[in-house]
Amino acid sequence: MSELIITPGCIVLIEGFDDIPAHQFLVDEVFDDFITGTALTGPFAGEYGEPEITLVLEVLSGNREG
C-alpha cells in the first residue's frame, strides 16, 4: 500500500469506528501518529478531533489554502 500524503489544509476520509460512519475531515496539523482538525460530515460535523493517522482511508483533496 502506498503512503498517503497528508498535509495541513487537505480533506481526508476517516474510517468508521464504533457506531460512527466514515466521514470527511479537514486537517489542521499532522503529527507522527495522529492528525488534528475538524469533522466535515457525519455526526461529529463541526467538531474538533484528533484521529489516529491509521484511520485515514484516503486523501480526498489537497491543501485548501491559496
Region spans (language model):
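Intrinsically disordered, low-complexity boundary segments flanking structured domains
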Residues: M1, I14, L40-P43
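Compositionally biased, low-complexity intrinsically disordered regions
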Residues: M1, T7, P51-T54
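Short coil-to-beta transition motif at edge beta-strands of beta-rich domains
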Residues: E3-F17
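Short beta-strand-centered aromatic/proline hotspots
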Residues: P21-V30
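Short aromatic-glycine-enriched beta-strand elements
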Residues: F34-T36
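Intrinsically disordered, low-complexity, charged/polar segments
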Residues: A39-G66
